[in-house]
């Protein structure tokens, strides 16, 4: 059985926008609607869980009504951090199956990437999509000096980060630590090693106004 937890706790501050970024409309619909539609098109039998702050849930219901969003999904309240939000999402899932944990503001994930993540997680336990870094990298030190580092030793990490449910649930029993930047870091802290799969360039996390413009063009194609 396949599950997807869509984490949508954004505030929209970097957008210079009062509307939380997952609700900003592009190509005729809120970003979050595009994201869940993408997963539904990938697999209509997937169980979708959206994690939203309590004070945004009524607004989301209204948006679903306005935009006629009828894709079946459960909504669970977000927590104090992303870690706690994912934990709340996991609490709705039985202990068997494969779960993809995905950013609500990544509506352009290629279906081949989602399929690869599910397939590899089923085989190996955990899978995360990554991309090589196109730009040069520099490390900055406390005294403001910097030095070039080898970018081939690094990758950019995307979502959906996908795991066997029993393993990621076990990992999320660990006490919260602020070094947990994503689900893979929690998974690793529990002693597991996620496999890396190839991501897709268009799978951008909509964070800045320029991302909105790019996503709008892609979604209208």
Name these PLM-found stretches.
Residues 15, 39, 60-64, 117, ...:
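Hydrophobic packing residues within well-ordered alpha-helices of enzyme cores
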Residues 46-48, 126, 193:
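Residues at the starts of beta-strands that form the adenosine-phosphate
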Residues 155-221:
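Conserved alpha/beta core of the MobA/IspD/sugar-nucleotide pyrophosphorylase nucleotidyltransferase superfamily
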Residues 1-58:
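N-terminal glycine-rich phosphate-binding loop and ensuing alpha1 helix
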Residues 33-96:
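Conserved N-terminal catalytic core of the sugar/cofactor nucleotidyltransferase
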């Amino acid at each position: 059985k396949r599950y997807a937890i869509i984490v949508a706790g954004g505030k929209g501050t970097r957008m210079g926008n009062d509307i939380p970024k997952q609700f900003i409309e592009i190509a005729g619909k809120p970003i979050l609607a595009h994201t869940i539609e993408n997963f539904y098109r990938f697999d209509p039998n997937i169980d979708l869980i959206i994690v939203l702050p309590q004070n945004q849930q009524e607004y989301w219901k209204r948006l679903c009504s306005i935009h006629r969003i009828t894709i079946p999904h459960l909504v669970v309240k977000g927590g104090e951090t992303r870690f706690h939000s994912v934990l709340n999402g996991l609490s709705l899932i039985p202990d068997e199956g494969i779960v993809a944990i995905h950013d609500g503001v990544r509506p352009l994930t290629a279906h081949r990437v989602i399929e690869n993540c599910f397939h590899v997680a089923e085989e190996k336990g955990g899978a995360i999509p990554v991309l090589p870094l196109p730009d040069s990298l520099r490390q900055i030190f406390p005294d403001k000096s910097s030095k070039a580092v080898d970018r081939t030793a690094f990758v950019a990490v995307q979502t959906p980060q996908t795991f066997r449910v029993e393993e990621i649930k076990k990992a999320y029993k660990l006490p919260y630590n602020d070094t947990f930047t994503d689900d893979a870091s929690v998974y690793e802290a529990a002693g597991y090693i996620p496999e890396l799969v190839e991501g897709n360039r268009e799978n951008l996390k909509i964070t800045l106004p320029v991302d909105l413009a790019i996503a709008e063009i892609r979604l209208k194609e």
